[in-house]
Design a protein with these regions (language model features):
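Conserved MFS/SLC helix-loop-helix module at the cytosolic interface between two early adjacent transmembrane helices
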Residues: 79-118
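C-terminal transmembrane helical hairpin of 12-TM major facilitator-type secondary transporters
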Residues: 276-280, 286, 293-345
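Hydrophobic core of transmembrane alpha-helices in multi-pass small-molecule transporters
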Residues: 39, 107, 119-135, 242, ...
Length: 424
C-alpha cells in the first residue's frame, strides 16, 4: 500500500476537473438551471413543518406519526443518495432529475390522499425522500463539479446552495397561503404540479456523453467507495454532517409547533421559516466564497460552534416574536452554509468522477441525523410534553461537530498508475 505521504500531494495538472477536450456546459447555464431546480425542490420541502398541525388535527394522528414520516423521508433521501448519485455520474443528470421530478409530484399527490399512518409514511416519507435524492444537491453539484473549473467550484456550489435558500424564503409564505386558501390537501396537489416543472428545467443540464464519464483516469465505483471510506477525513466529514442534519431538520419541522405551544401566532412561525431561508441565501453564498479562500475545515467548525451558541442564547432569553426572528436570522446564516464547503472538500480530495455518488454518501450521514432529529423531536415531545431535551441534544452535537471537523485534511489524493503501485 502506498504511504500516506506519497498518496497526498499538492494539486497538479487539473486532476479534479474534466480534460479540456471534454465537451462542457457553460457555467452560466449550469448555475441558472441548477439554481432553479434546487429552488423548487428545496423550497417545497422546507415548508413541510407547516402541515404538521393541520394534518394531525384533521386525521387525528399524534405528532410522532407525522414526525416518523418526515424522519423516513430524510432517511430515504439519504439512503437513495449514493445510488442516484452513481446513476447521475454514469448516465448524466437529466435522466435522474426527470425521474425525481415525477416521483416528487406523485409523492405529494399521495401524501394528500393518505388516510392511514402507514400510507402517509409511504408517500410523504419513502416516495418524496427518494424523489429528493434525485432533485437536490448531490445531482446538481455533480454537474457543477464536472463543468466548473476548480478555481471557482466552491463559489459555484455556494451559488446553488443560495438558490435553495431563496426557494425556502420564497416557498414558505406561498405554502402557508395555499393551505389557508385551498386547504392542506389541495395545497399539496398544487405543489405536486409545481414539482413537475423540474423536468423541463433539467433539459438545461443534459450533459454531453463524454462529460459524464471522463473526469480523470477511470476509477471503478467500488474502488472509489473503498478509497473514500478508508480516508479518516471522509469519516470525520460524515460525522459532522450527521450533526448538521439533526439540527436543521429538527428545527425546520418542530419549531412551528414549539412556538405554537408557547402561545405565539402561526404567522410568527411562518415568518421565522421564511427568515431562515432569506438569511441562508447570504450564508450559503458567503460560505461558498470563503471556502474558495480559507481552509474549509475551519469554516465548518466555526459554523457548528456558532449554531450551538445561537441555540443556547435562544433557550435562555424570553420567547417573543422578536427573539424568534433574531434567532431565525442567525440560524439562517448558518443553516445550509455547511453544504458548499462540505461538497467542495469531497471534490477537492477525491476528484469529480464520482462526485455525485460520494456526495450522496456524505449526505446519507446528514440524513441519518435528520431522521433522528425529526423523529426524536416528536417522540420526546409525546412522552415528556416538551422539546427541551432535544434542543440541548442539538447543542451538544454542535460542539462535537466543531471538534471533529478541525483535523480534516483537504489535500487532494493523487493516484499512482497501477504499474507504479505494483513495482512497490
Amino acid at each position: 500500500m502506498m504511504p500516506e505521504r506519497l498518496r497526498r500531494m499538492h494539486y497538479i495538472g487539473g486532476m479534479s476537473s474534466p480534460p479540456a477536450s471534454s465537451p462542457r456546459l457553460s457555467m452560466s447555464r449550469v448555475l441558472w438551471c441548477g439554481a432553479a431546480i434546487v429552488t423548487l425542490s428545496m423550497g417545497i420541502r422546507h415548508g413541510f413543518g407547516l402541515w404538521l398541525a393541520p394534518i394531525t388535527m384533521d386525521r387525528g394522528w399524534t405528532r410522532e406519526t407525522f414526525s416518523f414520516a418526515m424522519a423516513v423521508q430524510n432517511l430515504a433521501w439519504g439512503l437513495a443518495g449514493p445510488l442516484t448519485g452513481m446513476l447521475a455520474d454514469r448516465w448524466g443528470a437529466f435522466r435522474v432529475l426527470a425521474a425525481g421530478s415525477g416521483l416528487y409530484a406523485l409523492g405529494l399527490l399521495l401524501m394528500a390522499l393518505s388516510t392511514t399512518g402507514l400510507a402517509f409514511t409511504g408517500s410523504a416519507g419513502l416516495l418524496i425522500g427518494i424523489a429528493q435524492s434525485g432533485t437536490t444537491y448531490a445531482v446538481v453539484y455533480g454537474v457543477i463539479g464536472r463543468h466548473v473549473d476548480p478555481a471557482r467550484r466552491s463559489w459555484a456550489m455556494g451559488v446553488a446552495a443560495a438558490a435553495g435558500s431563496f426557494g425556502q424564503f420564497l416557498m414558505v409564505p406561498v405554502e402557508n397561503w395555499l393551505i389557508a386558501s385551498f386547504g392542506w390537501q389541495q395545497a399539496l396537489m398544487l405543489l405536486g404540479a409545481l414539482a413537475l416543472l423540474i423536468t423541463p428545467i433539467a433539459l438545461g443540464l443534459r450533459e454531453p456523453a463524454r462529460a459524464a464519464t471522463s473526469s480523470q483516469a477511470h476509477q471503478s465505483v467500488l474502488s472509489a467507495v473503498r478509497e473514500a471510506f478508508g480516508e479518516r477525513s471522509f469519516q470525520l466529514l460524515m460525522a459532522g454532517y450527521f450533526v448538521c442534519g439533526f439540527q436543521v431538520v429538527f428545527i425546520g419541522v418542530h419549531m412551528p409547533s414549539y412556538l405554537k405551544d408557547h402561545g405565539l401566532a402561526p404567522e410568527v412561525a411562518t415568518g421565522a421559516l421564511a427568515l431562515i431561508g432569506l438569511f441562508n441565501v447570504v450564508g450559503t453564498y458567503t460560505a461558498g466564497s470563503l471556502g474558495q479562500r480559507f481552509p474549509k475545515r475551519y469554516l465548518l467548525s466555526g459554523i457548528y460552534l456558532l449554531r450551538s451558541l445561537a441555540i443556547v442564547i435562544f433557550l435562555n432569553v424570553p420567547l417573543t416574536p422578536m427573539s424568534v426572528y433574531v434567532f431565525a436570522a442567525v440560524m439562517g446564516v448558518l443553516w445550509l452554509s455547511t453544504v458548499p464547503p462540505t461538497n467542495a472538500v469531497v471534490a477537492q480530495v477525491f476528484g469529480v468522477q464520482h462526485l455525485s455518488m460520494l456526495g450522496g454518501f456524505v449526505f446519507l450521514s446528514h440524513q441519518v441525523g435528520s431522521f433522528l432529529g425529526v423523529w426524536l423531536g416528536g417522540r420526546l415531545y409525546d412522552s415528556t410534553g416538551s422539546y427541551d431535551i432535544v434542543w440541548w441534544i442539538a447543542v451538544a452535537l454542535g460542539v462535537l461537530a466543531f471538534a471533529v471537523n478541525l483535523p480534516i485534511r483537504e489535500t487532494p489524493l493523487v493516484r499512482a498508475p497501477a504499474g507504479a503501485l505494483a513495482a512497490r
